[in-house]
Amino acid sequence: MPELPEVETTRRGIAPYLEGQRVERVIVRERRLRWPIPEDLDVRLSGQRIVSVERRAKYLLLGAEAGTLISHLGMSGSLRLVESGTPASRHEHVDIELASGMSLRYTDPRRFGAMLWSLAPLEHELLRNLGPEPLTDAFAGQRLFELSRGRSMAVKPFIMDNAVVVGVGNIYASEALFAAGIDPRKPAGSISKARYLRLAEEIKRILAIAIERGGTTLRDFVGGDGQPGYFQQELFVYGRGGEFCKVCGSTLREIRLGQRASVYCPRCQR
């Protein structure tokens, strides 16, 4: 699933080609995504100028003159630029044709993404209760410490809770906990303030590096230019269960935690 770095990589890739452009038309080949694409999306968006391309958590917000298109990439989705008129293959469900002669093409093999229209996107039910962005000053270790008090749940699902902080998915939660030396099974409420301060800094550092590398390509993800990300070459634990730890040489353990596979080092993470 594309996580925050992959979505931010997409945003940075498509924004220069979209902002200021007028939409000629919207071609929808398949409306049945996680939520159906609005039947009148072409009417609402055609003729409008795109004024901004922003991101909130894992949602892309294409701001037009009279509303905003909220897009989520789901499990396997991608947005990339193609020349208008380029034949669409299977799973290429939507084209937003621009006056420039380019089209923003949405591809989603599993159809678990979304394209929704909103006049007030930040008040939309999918966005209004989200926590702070991890790469802003609104997110810090102090927040993690305060929100974790009295919590018995494991620290990994705690930091993956979008009400606590947005965009920290399975890949980057695993890597940040390894970098901070914290066992992902440890109860969130038992972790000290000092360790949360370190964890927050590692979350910020790892997400920033992943964005610089264009995200992590494990299966389907490509950026707005159609190119894969390269952060997977720097993974220490995610997806490496049974392999040797790159730091201490111990065998990495894979467990189920919060209905997800989690890999950690029993020696480096306490």
Swiss-Prot record:
Q: Which cofactor does it need?
A: Zn(2+)
Outline the residue ranges of the record's FPG-type zinc fingers.
236-270
So where's the catalytic machinery, residue-wise? P2, E3, K58, R260
Coiled-coil region(s) = none
The record's EC number reads 3.2.2.23, 4.2.99.18
> Which residues make up the binding site for DNA?
H91, R110, R151
The answer to whether UniProt assigns keyword Kinase to this entry is no
Record family assignment: Belongs to the FPG family.
Q: Which Pfam families match?
A: Fapy_DNA_glyco (PF01149), H2TH (PF06831), zf-FPG_IleRS (PF06827)
Recorded source organism is Pseudomonas paraeruginosa (strain DSM 24068 / PA7)
Give the protein's recorded name: Formamidopyrimidine-DNA glycosylase
**Cofactor notes:** Binds 1 zinc ion per subunit.
User: Which purpose does this protein serve, as stated in its record?
Assistant: Involved in base excision repair of DNA damaged by oxidation or by mutagenic agents. Acts as a DNA glycosylase that recognizes and removes damaged bases. Has a preference for oxidized purines, such as 7,8-dihydro-8-oxoguanine (8-oxoG). Has AP (apurinic/apyrimidinic) lyase activity and introduces nicks in the DNA strand. Cleaves the DNA backbone by beta-delta elimination to generate a single-strand break at the site of the removed base with both 3'- and 5'-phosphates.
**What is the primary gene name for this protein?**
mutM
According to UniProt, the reaction catalysed is:
Hydrolysis of DNA containing ring-opened 7-methylguanine residues, releasing 2,6-diamino-4-hydroxy-5-(N-methyl)formamidopyrimidine; 2'-deoxyribonucleotide-(2'-deoxyribose 5'-phosphate)-2'-deoxyribonucleotide-DNA = a 3'-end 2'-deoxyribonucleotide-(2,3-dehydro-2,3-deoxyribose 5'-phosphate)-DNA + a 5'-end 5'-phospho-2'-deoxyribonucleoside-DNA + H(+)
Q: Which CDD domains match?
A: EcFpg-like_N
